[in-house]
Amino acid sequence: MERIPSAQPPPTCLPKAPGLEPGDLPGMDFAHMYQVYKSRRGIKRSEDSKETYKLPHRLIEKKRRDRINECIAQLKDLLPEHLKLTTLGHLEKAVVLELTLKHVKALTNLIDQQQQKIIALQSGLQAGDLSGRNVEAGQEMFCSGFQTCAREVLQYLAKHENTRDLKSSQLVTHLHRVVSELLQGGTSRKPSDPAPKAMDFKEKPSSLAKGSEGPGKNCVPVIQRTFAHSSGEQSGSDTDTDSGYGGESEKSELRVEQPYFKSDHGRRFTMGERISAIKQESEEPPMKKSRMQLSDDEGPFTSTDLISSPFLGPHPHQPPFCLPFYLIPPSATAYLPMLEKCWYPTSVPVLYPGLNASAAALSSFMNPDKISAPLLMPQRLPSPLPSHPAIDSSALLQALKQIPPLNLETKD
């Protein structure tokens, strides 16, 4: 019979083969094959963790439900009473949540309205009218209302002359009546009426004061030139005008008064003629002239200075009295050019009006030593330019005698 080798035990004489270790086989690594095998201890631990997880999950769910119920109970307590009365019976959880949602929406709408009102107030608009009104429109409305109130007060006070008997209650009732008429749209009073006589009431005290004073009380006496007919008065008036008082402050007051003034003789003359008689001082200092300009103007005195100067200027209403050429004798015409340079700045001097001394004038031309003091021309202030030296009269006459006389024929 044949034996089955699997049923027979191995012979004991054969030695046991030693186990192979990884270090015995060089070049071969079996470390990656070790991970395939798992220990039974890890499997047992995972099963134990599942069993232990079920217990805390139940506790967590229980706690979560408890928190939900507690929050719903608090919402139920916080709901207003009018919302609780809308439902009958017990308030379920779903009903409490619905009422809470409704109440929150109402509060949100209210907050939105309040925000709009706050924005309107910050931008200067009225709470009821949020369309196109700006700050300027509000200011104009305030000013128009104030003007209307002031106009009514002034008109009411103007009707009652005796203000002592007037009471404040009467004025208040009058203003209330006017406001009611304006609100009703009465045609008798319109806010667009012309402004009242407010300015008239304000200007009445000042106008009355001016009227009581009269035109002459505001006038201050101004030092003016008085054209006298005698030499003594004329010499005394020269010192008055040189006092340095120019009357600058009175010019503005005189311009406010009447444009025409009456003189002592009843003649009317304008403001310009009256101011021309007042001494005026130029604001800018006079410009210095060179010698060439001085020779062109014929010495230190010019014809324009003599005409416009207050010393030799004629009366504004009387023509100047000039000495004609035919009154000068032929003998004087010979040395007349020298007299122009030495004594007289112009060939024809201007005399004061009303001077009844034609013969005296001729004698003064012939004899310069006998010229009276009032008829002498005033000298200007000393200028830096060199002036012509004065010549003695005796030396002048001797020099003139040596000059041959010119054959000049004059008219009758």
Curated annotation (Swiss-Prot):
Organism classification: Eukaryota, Metazoa, Chordata, Craniata, Vertebrata
UniProt PTM comment: Ubiquitinated; which may lead to proteasomal degradation.
Subcellular location: Cytoplasm; Nucleus
Principal location listed in the UniProt entry: cytoplasm
Modified residues (Phosphoserine): 235, 383
Span list, region Disordered: 1-21, 182-257, 279-298
Source species, domain of life: Eukaryota
Domain (Orange) ranges: 142-175
Cross-link (Glycyl lysine isopeptide (Lys-Gly) (interchain with G-Cter in SUMO1, SUMO2 and SUMO3)): 159, 279
Chain intervals for the UniProt region annotation (Necessary for interaction with RXRA and repressor activity against RXRA): 75-79
Cross-link Glycyl lysine isopeptide (Lys-Gly) (interchain with G-Cter in SUMO1), sequence positions: 279
Residue spans of biased composition, Basic and acidic residues class: 248-257
Cross-referenced Pfam families: Hairy_orange, HLH
GO molecular function terms attached to this record: DNA-binding transcription repressor activity, RNA polymerase II-specific; E-box binding; MRF binding; protein domain specific binding; protein heterodimerization activity; protein homodimerization activity; RNA polymerase II-specific DNA-binding transcription factor binding
Region Essential for interaction with BMAL1, E-box binding and repressor activity against the CLOCK-BMAL1 heterodimer, residue ranges: 1-139
Transmembrane segments: none
Protein name: Class E basic helix-loop-helix protein 40
Keyword annotations: Biological rhythms, Cytoplasm, DNA-binding, Isopeptide bond, Nucleus, Phosphoprotein, Repressor, Transcription, Transcription regulation, Ubl conjugation
GO biological process, one term: circadian regulation of gene expression
